[in-house]
Amino acid sequence: MYSSPKKNEPKYITDFCPISLGNIVSRIISKVLANRIKCILPNVIFDSQSAFVPNRSIIDNITVAYEMLHRMRNRRKGKTWHMVVKLDISKAYDRVEWEFLQRIMLKIGILTQWVHLPMETVRTTSYSILINGEPTGFITPSRGIKQGDPLSPYLFLLCAEGLSPLIRKAIVNHHLKGVVSCNGGVKISHLLFANDSLLFCEATTRECKHLLDILALYEGASGQAINRHKTTLFFNPNTNQGVKLAIQNMLGVQIMTNCERYLGLPMVGEKSKVSTFREIQEWVTKRVIGWKEKHISKAGREVLIKTVIQAIPTYSMSMFKFSKKICDDIDLVLLQYWGGRLKMKEKSIESSHAS
């Protein structure tokens, strides 16, 4: 097991992410089981989850999430208030209870004989921690699934599926109401993508209490723990300020800021797209500044621009139409880098010939 730091200057144990380095045989077995289990996922995983499910895309979650947030952000009148809870799960893989995982697989209809196979790969795991590069002793875990294992994402997906029935049952019993996507549209109550979850409900202390009960039940059964330091809230503008504070105190979380992100993209955009995606240009500029100090050939600069720089905005552009100003600013940075290096090279060559 190797602990990879999440930050440049980690101070606490929570700032590290444990990465399991498995042997070849176990990875082959896990890969075979993963290829088998992913074939049945579209039939047993509800549409609210998109991660690792064949024929489902991350774009599905992003599209629905941004449409919902856009509608909520523009709702400034009315007596009904709504909110979005962006959940953050602490050490999601490491806290999975094996008994819960096994019962989930049996509940969704997987044969008992087949459930035994992935559970054996989980229960027969042992860890040896690398200290200064040397393996030291062995640890036999009693819960959790391995980071980096081919089968682990699918097992965690099944574990997260335990939250969906609780929310759907609350909707049926009118404990939660969800948020309507449009006039006459369907109600959206939750979107799950691995451990990135969005919960939609009315901004009332009553629904907040029911939501807390659901999360407490899920935490107790699955072993998962909500990280309240990173979990955030978003309210539509017409929500009463007193209600906001009451719900914030009940949940013990922070209200969402403009810099909050969902699946790698900003959740709450500015009025201008230029302001919202200004960080794209900043990322490009930082990369170029780092290369400027290095002696890179013309062919090397061309490869870096095409393979690295042009790939930076691709993910965001797949979802949003960038304004012409953003594209022009990025092009200007690249032209300055490209042209500036060429001029410096030409001057140095001319001076060397003159001498």
Please state what every model-predicted region is.
Residues 1-355:
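Nucleotidyl polymerases of mobile genetic elements and RNA viruses
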